[in-house]
Each structure stands twice: as C-alpha cells, then as structure tokens.
C-alpha cells in the first residue's frame, strides 16, 4: 500500500506523511496510525487523491476535536483541508466560508463585520465542514439556521452545490455521506450592532464557563439528547458521573462530556 501512496504523492503538491500517528491530530490523543495523512491545499490535489478511492480508503477530518481513532489505526489516507479551504468572504448578503475554517474563527469574523447569529460557533470545537455534516449547535442555535447551500465534491471528482433543503438537516444530523466532501458553505448575512453581538457572545461564554469543563480538551457533548430528556441527566441517574476508565473519565462538571 505504501507504493500506492508514493504514486499518489508523485502526482500532487501536498505532502503525504506515511504511517502517521493520529494521536498528534486528535484532541483525545488516543488511537493508532493511519497509512497516510495529508493536508490538501488545492481542489486539484483533492481530486487526484480521491480518484484512487477504489484502491485506498480515505477519511476527511477537521481539527480532530470530535474524532476517536481505534488502536488498530486506519488502513487508508486521512485527509485534512488546508489553507486554501480556510477562507471567509462576504458577497453582499452572503457569507462564503471554507469547510476548513474553524468554528471559532467564523464567530470572530462575523463579530468583526457586525454579522449576527454566528455567536454560538464561538463555543463549538471543530471546523465548518464538520459543523455542517452534524448540524452542530448549542444554546438554541444550529448551523442550519442561516445556511443557504454548500459546495461538495464526490469520489468521482464531480463538484456541485447542494441546497439547505437537500441536506435534510435535523437535530445533530444531515444526509451527507462520507463519500461527499464539503468544500465551502454559503450563509445568509444578517447585520446588527457590535454591542448586541458581543452581548450574546458573552452570554454564551458565561454559560459555558459555568456548566462545562472548558479547561479540558473535549469533543463537546458526547451523546445526543433523546426526545424530552437530557443525556447528562440520564448519565447522572445511571450513576456514571465522574466514572473513570484508564485515562478517560466522565466529567464531574457536565456528565455529557468525556475528558
């Protein structure tokens, strides 16, 4: 398989790291090696890599904040979107955001440009691509709220737009398969005063500081809330708050966080 990866490397400009220790790129700092790890800096390179999908598996990652790698590692290529997918642009009433942009950086950009309703992203670890796939959200807001459409590429190298309705966005879910890679997203722009945006952002910050283990690197809430219930409350009722197994434990601050 290394010979195949070397063949792919010869056709792209982005560097592939062989036998990559995934502990370096996940917040849990656990798991085995991937056959290869590449930070892709162009659509051209991305197309080349996925053109070999019938010969080698691939998996797209963001910053590894919501990723657990098994001890046996991953028998394929881990792909991370690089700097050319980390751009944010404003075009009239549309905010175009690269899939590799950090959620927190989108929140900062929105504040700097007096664009409201992106404050909740300041409390979500991860990238916009991942936020779209799981319809990430918190404190009454979610990624779907202002989303208009996304640009994706499939394993055949075809690029197309998908509208918000086509994604069937629901509570922490979408119909996006692993076969589709999100390249960018277009959001609606709604303007407000900086003071109003800062007030909402500070409210979210205070809520997080008072109820979440923010001093630890976590993947956020681990389990979805079932209808009419809170996962954290159910975990506490089961007597699992503070439970430990090796170096992992259920947070005593918020039972739905694993640290």
Regions found by a protein language model. Name each.
Residues 1-128:
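Anion-binding (especially nucleotide phosphate/pyrophosphate-binding) glycine-rich loop
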Residues 17-18, 24, 153-259:
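Phosphate/pyrophosphate- and phosphate-bearing ligand-binding catalytic cores of soluble enzymes
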Residues 27-35, 72-74, 79, 129, ...:
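Short capping/connector residues at structural and topological boundaries
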Residues 28-31, 60-61, 68-72, 88-90, ...:
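Solvent-exposed alpha-helices and their adjacent loops that cap or buttress functional pockets
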Residues 29, 96, 119, 133, ...:
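Conserved beta-strand segments that form the floor/walls of ligand-binding pockets within enzyme
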Residues 38-43, 68-86, 133-164, 177-184:
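Structural signature of FAD isoalloxazine-binding scaffolds in flavoprotein oxidoreductases
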Residues 90-94, 98-104, 117, 123, ...:
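Contiguous, small/hydrophobic- and glycine-enriched helical/loop subdomains that border
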Residues 117-148, 218, 222:
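A gly/ser-rich beta-alpha-beta helix-loop segment of oxidoreductase catalytic cores
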